[in-house]
């Protein structure tokens, strides 16, 4: 569950390392976001000479959460950190690689481009 002010790790090679959630998109009173949801983030920490700069405001898609994801077969999956992938205004990922695992729930939400960039899908 991601809410406003949550600090997140960036799981791609766009240049940002840490971002902070500004808004969870999808309704005026929506408080929490989970895997596959779109949020607005501010870049807090980044690498030099990359595509994004500190202070940039970008959209991102949540790919990993600490909160368990319950599946229909009775299994659960959770990760050790909260992570996002930065996207542009058209919904295309800014980075060219995704580091770490992502969940197969992203494929159900029609985020196939992110799943194809990921090294492993759980």
From Swiss-Prot:
PANTHER family: 50S/60S RIBOSOMAL PROTEIN L14/L23, LARGE RIBOSOMAL SUBUNIT PROTEIN UL14M. Signal peptide: none annotated. Keywords: Mitochondrion, Ribonucleoprotein, Ribosomal protein. GO terms for molecular function: large ribosomal subunit rRNA binding; structural constituent of ribosome. HAMAP family: Ribosomal_uL14. It comes from Reclinomonas americana. Its main location: mitochondrion. Gene3D superfamilies: Ribosomal protein L14. This is Large ribosomal subunit protein uL14m. PROSITE patterns: RIBOSOMAL_L14. SMART domains: Ribosomal_L14. CDD domains: Ribosomal_uL14 (cd00337). GO terms for cellular component: mitochondrial large ribosomal subunit. It is found in: Mitochondrion. Belongs to the universal ribosomal protein uL14 family. Pfam families: Ribosomal_L14.
């Amino acid at each position: 569950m991601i809410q406003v002010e949550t600090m997140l790790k960036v799981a791609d090679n766009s240049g940002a390392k840490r971002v902070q959630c500004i808004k969870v998109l999808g309704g005026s009173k929506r408080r929490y976001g989970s895997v596959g949801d779109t949020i607005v983030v501010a870049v807090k920490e980044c690498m030099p000479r990359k595509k994004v700069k500190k202070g940039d405001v970008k959209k991102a898609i949540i790919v990993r959460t600490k909160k368990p994801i319950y599946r229909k077969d009775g299994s659960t999956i959770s990760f050790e950190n909260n992570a996002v992938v930065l996207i542009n205004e058209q919904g295309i990922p800014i980075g060219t690689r995704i580091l770490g695992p992502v969940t197969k729930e992203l494929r159900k939400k029609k985020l196939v481009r992110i799943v194809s960039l990921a090294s492993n899908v759980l």
